């Protein structure tokens, strides 16, 4: 068969008040290389032992749900996306599985279909839509209907502060309230609206202000990520636009002027020595498929 490789970017979700809606693709990647057919699915990887190497692997199980008639293959998976750190590792695996089914099953899925399927699996469009489309996305899931808008944000730099500790998404969601008072919802929604408008109009200072005024989730998750306020304060002093939890955490996501990202990252690394400080870029390509040769990490 023609060698096939799939590359899926990481993502950050929410960007503060854009809860389960706003996502940004990042320059960390999951790679899947499809090898020969086999009598059963085999996943070659060097991750921790808890990650399955058979058809229970999230990439393979997703692919088989999308196209149950797929012939088993041996696939090799590599990734520099940290697991359970709020950088879309599970979303990237779901997106990779959909593309694996699309390629091997010759499904000819459209971009919109991929986003719809991925959102149905994930439950919200922010991470998966960003990984599929690249750039910054704003999405909404209403019942089974998904609407997504993509915008460019090439003037922005990204820094991620990644702790050593993991934080399971289910655990992080468990601290959120079941009921949100109407007046709080109005306030939180207005802030989110201004965030999206500022992203579209490239008013980065306003973006930074809004992403630090979330009411939907960050106030409830602070107990799980206690360093967020001090990181936010330092990042602002160093010249960043704004700081927020990356997805459900525990990683911290910072938007900066593109030309200042390295300087700000170096300053933060000197202060927060217990965390891994990554200077990243926004990925503008989204998922890519290479049928000729695989370029590894």
Curated annotation (Swiss-Prot):
SUPFAM superfamilies: GHMP Kinase, C-terminal domain, Ribosomal protein S5 domain 2-like. It is an enzyme of class 2 (transferase). It catalyses: L-homoserine + ATP = O-phospho-L-homoserine + ADP + H(+). One of its GO terms (molecular function) is homoserine kinase activity. Its main location: cytoplasm. Its EC number is 2.7.1.39. GO terms for biological process: threonine biosynthetic process. GO terms for cellular component: cytoplasm. Pfam families: GHMP_kinases_C (PF08544), GHMP_kinases_N (PF00288). Pathway: Amino-acid biosynthesis; L-threonine biosynthesis; L-threonine from L-aspartate: step 4/5. ATP binds at residues 82-92. It comes from the Bacteria. Keywords: Amino-acid biosynthesis, ATP-binding, Cytoplasm, Kinase, Nucleotide-binding, Threonine biosynthesis, Transferase. The keyword Electron transport does not apply. It is found in: Cytoplasm. PANTHER family: HOMOSERINE KINASE, HOMOSERINE/4-DIPHOSPHOCYTIDYL-2-C-METHYL-D-ERYTHRITOL KINASE. HAMAP family: Homoser_kinase. Belongs to the GHMP kinase family. Homoserine kinase subfamily. Catalyzes the ATP-dependent phosphorylation of L-homoserine to L-homoserine phosphate. This is Homoserine kinase. It comes from Bacillus cereus (strain AH820). The gene is thrB.
